[in-house]
């Protein structure tokens, strides 16, 4: 039996909104597997939906850089330990230099990018007194690229055809706010669809309806699900009366791809004493 820790119960509560005892029971039944616990809670009606894993706990900045022709761009995440350093001029200048190099040399391998700037990073760490990490980099190509940055913590890059700069900017702002995972409903992977379909079918069957009626109920729920996780299926944040897909159709435009980075996605900042860490490293040297 896996150990059911308080932090595991806390995470399940945060992701489902369910009570502490319900979460602890679900984790015990799932032998500590939080994803299985969430599935079981959804099937039983204890959790209607679940937030994605990965609390944003790291500090840092997201930078986007686009080539002069507007057809190629990169997006980079740089992490530090505190918000104070994230606003430091030296840290921001270093991050900008890294992003500029990634664009100029088309460096999208994170290890290559880290190696290129390791000496400068080490010097900056010694100067600032905090750990700094070049966390990830990605690229995007297209007929026209647009970007949006929200307070340096969220960065979006969009590739589109048939769109002007204003439209693509609005689409990027929508992506920053609504967090779509795919461009179109049909882009949702088959395994993701199958997983959600099974959950919705189990929920529908518990209502006592015959299977064929339950299947019909699930069809509607699945259309809603794929719409909610895809850009074109979402209601446009600036005009909820239409979907992003309808907006694009009005302008005879298409989105061919997008990237959305948010500082600290998928990681939780480990509370460590950096001075003690450096001291420990010195002893081991």
Swiss-Prot record:
InterPro entries: EF-Ts_dimer_sf (IPR036402), Transl_elong_EFTs/EF1B (IPR001816), Transl_elong_EFTs/EF1B_dimer (IPR014039), Transl_elong_Ts_CS (IPR018101), UBA-like_sf (IPR009060). One of its GO terms (molecular function) is translation elongation factor activity. GO terms for cellular component: cytoplasm. It is found in: Cytoplasm. Disulfide bonds: none annotated. HAMAP family: EF_Ts. Associates with the EF-Tu.GDP complex and induces the exchange of GDP to GTP. It remains bound to the aminoacyl-tRNA.EF-Tu.GTP complex up to the GTP hydrolysis stage on the ribosome. Belongs to the EF-Ts family. This is Elongation factor Ts. It comes from Edwardsiella ictaluri (strain 93-146).
């Amino acid at each position: 039996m896996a150990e059911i820790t308080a932090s595991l119960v806390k995470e399940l509560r945060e992701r489902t909104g369910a009570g502490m005892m319900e979460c602890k029971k679900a984790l015990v039944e799932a032998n500590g597997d939080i994803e299985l616990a969430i599935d079981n809670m959804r099937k039983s009606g204890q959790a209607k939906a679940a937030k994605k894993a990965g609390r944003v706990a790291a500090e840092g900045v997201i930078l986007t850089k686009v080539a002069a022709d507007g057809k190629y761009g990169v997006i980079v995440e740089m992490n530090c330990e505190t918000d104070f350093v994230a606003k430091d001029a030296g840290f921001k200048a270093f991050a900008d230099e890294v992003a500029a190099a990634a664009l100029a040399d088309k460096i999208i391998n994170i290890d290559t990018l880290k190696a290129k700037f390791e000496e400068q990073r080490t010097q900056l760490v010694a100067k600032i007194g905090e750990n700094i990490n070049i966390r990830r980099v990605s690229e995007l190509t297209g007929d026209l690229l647009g970007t949006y940055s929200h307070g340096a913590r969220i960065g979006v890059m969009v590739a589109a055809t048939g769109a002007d700069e204003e439209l693509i900017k609005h689409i990027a702002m929508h992506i920053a706010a609504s967090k779509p995972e795919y461009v179109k409903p049909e882009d949702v992977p088959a395994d993701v669809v199958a997983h959600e379909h099974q959950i919705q079918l189990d929920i529908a069957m518990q209502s006592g309806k015959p299977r064929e009626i339950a299947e019909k109920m699930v069809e509607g729920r699945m259309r809603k699900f794929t719409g909610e996780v895809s850009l074109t299926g979402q209601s446009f944040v600036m005009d909820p009366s239409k979907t992003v897909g309808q907006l694009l159709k009005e302008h005879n435009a298409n989105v061919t791809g997008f990237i959305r980075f948010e500082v600290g996605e998928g990681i939780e900042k480990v509370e460590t004493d950096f001075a003690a860490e450096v001291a420990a490293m010195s002893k081991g040297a």
